[in-house]
Curated annotation (Swiss-Prot):
Keywords: Hydrolase, Multifunctional enzyme, Purine biosynthesis, Transferase. Pathway: Purine metabolism; IMP biosynthesis via de novo pathway; 5-formamido-1-(5-phospho-D-ribosyl)imidazole-4-carboxamide from 5-amino-1-(5-phospho-D-ribosyl)imidazole-4-carboxamide (10-formyl THF route): step 1/1; Purine metabolism; IMP biosynthesis via de novo pathway; IMP from 5-formamido-1-(5-phospho-D-ribosyl)imidazole-4-carboxamide: step 1/1. GO terms for cellular component: cytosol. GO terms for biological process: 'de novo' IMP biosynthetic process. This is Bifunctional purine biosynthesis protein PurH. It catalyses: (6R)-10-formyltetrahydrofolate + 5-amino-1-(5-phospho-beta-D-ribosyl)imidazole-4-carboxamide = 5-formamido-1-(5-phospho-D-ribosyl)imidazole-4-carboxamide + (6S)-5,6,7,8-tetrahydrofolate; IMP + H2O = 5-formamido-1-(5-phospho-D-ribosyl)imidazole-4-carboxamide. InterPro entries: AICAR_Tfase_dup_dom_sf (IPR024051), Cytidine_deaminase-like (IPR016193), MGS-like_dom (IPR011607), MGS-like_dom_sf (IPR036914), PurH-like (IPR002695). PROSITE patterns: MGS (PS51855). Belongs to the PurH family. The IMP cyclohydrolase activity resides in the N-terminal region. Residues 1-146 form the MGS-like domain. Its EC number is 2.1.2.3, 3.5.4.10. GO terms for molecular function: IMP cyclohydrolase activity; phosphoribosylaminoimidazolecarboxamide formyltransferase activity. The gene is purH.
Length: 511
């Protein structure tokens, strides 16, 4: 008797080629449902519709197709158990040798802007996971394929050995259970997130995309995992050139992506970053000017840095970049002239990520015995809600500068201070255990350029010492969240010293 395979896939990549080889080279009979059967018939592949095989029509608009004893009996039957074989014969059920199934694109659906719950629900697969789990459970007797990347390995084993080795069937089963686990977890997370509250159950699942040489340090092992079936985010980035990405590269690139995403793509912006902290950020009329301003903000720290741009990389900007050693560059595009220039630095990693705006909606940190989950700090603030708390009012130009400094400060490790002028960072005080210490570091970097500059603080000033220190160096405008028991002391000092100070009402700790 010919072997029997069931094919029912949402992702139809390679399915026609697989079906043709199963029929022509290995004499399989095929059964299929819905769109897959239609695709195979149109390609001239002989196939029997599931409804014809089971004798039961597809019902409820296609919600019930494969949930039938002739399908699941054929999947779950143990070939070495006489009672199972007797049941198959009594019910005219053929054993299934191969089940090829992938699932409705639930994650891709919920990622679309404005998707409704009803639309999401229709992409929750029922029959697919049931068949996948059943086949994976019975891997001792049958094979499940859940990814087009598996097709060639299956066909090669069949060609070379005439059957699928147990170890390979077991491997496919493990991958199948990982898929259904991730799928169910995505659905659970979606429904938990609808309420906006912390879920009672939260899971994270990923597929190893790339083993990394090591983690933050050479003695630490690491891997890069991709969430979802389809590549998104950095997994979708195109690497034009350069060495393999490291763990630290990816961490820094994500930090750079978050900062560059703060700025409107209509105004050229450049970010240079080291160890997840920006050392230079600038806006300018042209991209090359923005990069040069960001570089000059702290040329020493820029050596070996990560650069992010909000506009496609052009020749003049690339020419400026190759004058120093950089680890990585990411931009939404890159023209031919820039590629030719950058190619001279063959170790320089250059990535194209058109969608720099899309990032994770949550952040997760491991702790002993569990992990912490929080929503991402990515909400856009409305400056009209900010409060000027000093007697002196900011000009329109000063308000724009304060907004720029505030956007950068949000992405500096706490305690965070940024000093800016002309939409360019002059000094960055990061990660100090006391706020005035971060102020002093930022002022030291800014030097005499602090005269007439703007200062941003990611959290309130517990005392007025930071205000007085800033004013003594020439700072004229300050932006901070407010919220200290001693806010009035800082306001009084600002008024006394003739400063402008704004309270945003939003804190941006970053640990």
């Amino acid at each position: 008797m010919a072997r029997l395979a069931l094919l029912s896939v949402s992702d139809k990549s390679g399915i026609v080629e697989l079906a043709q080889r199963l029929v022509n080279e290995f004499q399989f009979d095929l059964i299929s449902s819905g769109g897959t059967a239609k695709t195979l018939k149109e390609a001239g592949v002989p196939v029997t519709k599931v409804s014809d095989y089971t004798g039961a029509p597809e019902i409820l608009g296609g919600r019930v197709k494969t949930l039938h004893p002739r399908i699941h009996g054929g999947i779950l039957a143990r070939r070495d158990l006489p009672s199972d074989q007797a049941d198959l014969e009594a019910n005219d059920i053929r054993p299934l040798d191969l089940v090829v199934v992938n699932l409705y694109p639930f994650e891709q659906t919920i990622a679309k802007p404005g998707v409704t719950v009803a639309e999401a629900v229709e992409q929750i697969d029922i029959g697919g996971p049931a068949m996948i789990r059943a086949t994976a459970k019975n891997f001792a007797h049958t094979t499940v394929l859940t990814n087009p990347n598996q097709y060639e390995a299956y066909l090669q084993a069949l060609q070379e050995q005439g059957e699928i080795p147990l170890a390979l069937r077991q491997q496919f089963a493990g991958e199948a259970f990982a898929l259904t686990n991730a799928y169910d977890q995505a659905i659970a997370n979606y429904f938990s997130g609808l309420s906006g509250d912390s879920a009672n159950q939260f899971g994270l699942s990923g597929t190893l995309r790339q083993p990394l040489r090591y983690g933050e340090n050479p003695h630490q092992s690491a891997g890069w995992y991709q969430t979802g079936r389809e590549a998104t985010g950095w997994a979708k980035a195109e690497k034009l050139q350069g060495k393999e990405l490291s763990y630290n590269n990816l961490v820094d690139l994500e930090a750079a992506r978050r900062i560059i995403n703060e700025f409107d793509v209509r105004e050229p912006a450049a970010v240079i970053l080291k160890h997840t902290n920006p050392c230079g950020v600038a806006l300018a009329p042209t991209l090359v000017e923005a990069y040069q301003k960001a570089f000059n903000a702290d040329a020493t720290s820029a050596f070996g840095g990560i650069v992010a741009l909000n506009q496609p990389l052009d020749g003049p900007t690339a020419a400026a970049m190759v004058k120093t050693f950089l680890e990585c560059i990411v931009a939404p595009g890159c023209d031919a002239e820039a590629q030719e220039i950058l190619a001279k630095k063959n170790n320089l990693r250059v990535l194209i990520l058109p969608d720099l705006a899309t990032g994770p909606s949550q952040t997760i940190k491991a702790i002993a015995g569990g992990f912490l989950v929080q929503s991402a700090d990515d909400e856009r603030e409305d400056p009209s809600t900010w409060q000027v708390v000093t007697e002196k009012q900011p000009s329109g130009e000063e308000l724009a500068e304060l907004a720029f400094a505030w956007k950068v400060c949000k992405h500096v490790k706490s305690n965070a201070i940024t000093i800016t002028k002309n939409k360019t960072t002059l000094g960055v005080g990061a990660g100090q255990m006391n706020r005035v210490g971060s102020v002093e570091i930022a002022l030291k970097q800014a030097g005499t350029e602090a005269q007439g500059a703007c200062l941003a603080s990611d959290a309130f000033f517990p005392f007025d010492d930071s205000v007085r220190t800033a004013a003594a160096a020439g700072i004229t405008t300050i932006i901070q969240p407010g919220g200290s028991m001693r806010d009035q002391d800082s306001i009084q000092a600002a008024n006394e010293l003739g400063l402008v100070m704004i309270f945003t009402g939003v804190r941006h700790f970053l640990h």
